[in-house]
From Swiss-Prot:
Part of the 50S ribosomal subunit. Belongs to the bacterial ribosomal protein bL31 family. Type B subfamily. Keywords: Ribonucleoprotein, Ribosomal protein. It comes from Micrococcus luteus (strain ATCC 4698 / DSM 20030 / JCM 1464 / CCM 169 / CCUG 5858 / IAM 1056 / NBRC 3333 / NCIMB 9278 / NCTC 2665 / VKM Ac-2230). SUPFAM superfamilies: L28p-like (SSF143800). It comes from the Bacteria. This is Large ribosomal subunit protein bL31B. GO terms for molecular function: structural constituent of ribosome. GO terms for cellular component: ribonucleoprotein complex; ribosome. One of its GO terms (biological process) is translation. The keyword Cell membrane does not apply.
Length: 85
């Protein structure tokens, strides 16, 4: 393998702003903001707006959209549009 062609892969704390959950993982992303983790070490912090800890799909709080009514309403509105001349 060639040396010095791979990006710096290091530990980072991802902070979910929606839920307050913090996740320590590895990434190539950088940040100037730092925080101390439970192991006593200081790591860069990257704020994310949403993660698996707060996304409705993963938390089970998702809404199911009723698309059948919307399709019927669309078809009723445009049923005569673009017909043969």
């Amino acid at each position: 393998m060639k040396s010095e062609i791979h990006p710096d892969y290091h530990y980072v704390i991802f902070n979910d702003l929606a839920s307050g959950e913090k996740i320590l993982t590895r990434t190539t992303a950088n940040s100037d903001k730092t925080a101390e983790w439970t192991d006593g070490n200081t790591y860069p912090v990257i704020d994310v707006e949403i993660s698996a800890a707060s996304h409705p799909f993963y938390t089970g709080k998702q809404r199911i959209m009723d698309t059948a009514g919307r399709v019927e309403r669309f078809n009723a509105r445009f049923k005569g549009f673009g017909g043969k001349k």
